[in-house]
Amino acid sequence: MKVVSSIKSAKKRHPACQVVRRRGKIYVINKVEPRYKARQG
């Protein structure tokens, strides 16, 4: 999982990326390609 400063660029890396908020952190998850996981914060 990458730690990124820009969620927008992480979301645009793959069409299946979703932005989710958990425990005060913002995550980008992708069930099709799990290597595109990222978090911010």
Curated annotation (Swiss-Prot):
Keyword Ribosomal protein: yes
GO biological process, one term: translation
Molecular function terms from GO: structural constituent of ribosome
Keyword presence, Ribosomal protein: yes
Membrane-spanning residues: none
A Pfam cross-reference name: Ribosomal_L36
Leader peptide range in chain numbering: none
Listed GO CC annotations: ribonucleoprotein complex; ribosome
Domain of life: Bacteria
InterPro entries: Ribosomal_bL36, Ribosomal_bL36_sp, Ribosomal_L36_bact
Sorted UniProt keywords: Ribonucleoprotein, Ribosomal protein
Family the entry assigns: Belongs to the bacterial ribosomal protein bL36 family.
PANTHER family attached to this UniProt entry: 50S RIBOSOMAL PROTEIN L36 2, LARGE RIBOSOMAL SUBUNIT PROTEIN BL36B
Protein name per UniProt: Large ribosomal subunit protein bL36
Species: Opitutus terrae (strain DSM 11246 / JCM 15787 / PB90-1)
Gene from which this protein is expressed: rpmJ
